[in-house]
Amino acid sequence: MINVKSLKFNADEKLLDFIEKKVGKVEKFFDNMGDIDVTLSLLPDAENKSVKLQTHIPGEDLIIERNARTFEEAVTEAADVLKEKIVRAKEKKFAK
């Protein structure tokens, strides 16, 4: 399950749908993964859109933060990194 929280602003439906699609793809890579918490916030600098993804897989908490000019860009980067970490953790688990 994907839980989205936006700090100090209201995310529109288009952004929420985008997050569901991008982050939802990550869920299929690990069966026993916990919920994915997505936190959106605005920063005072040029790359002012911040995205934080948090989830738990057995034996490890995963937290990825990315900043970009748009939320879509930050979500894409964070989801890609999360996917890589999950795949690595899964490979490590099955290598034992």
Region locations from a protein language model:
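N-terminal, polar/charged subdomain of small-to-medium soluble alpha/beta proteins
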Residues: 1-96
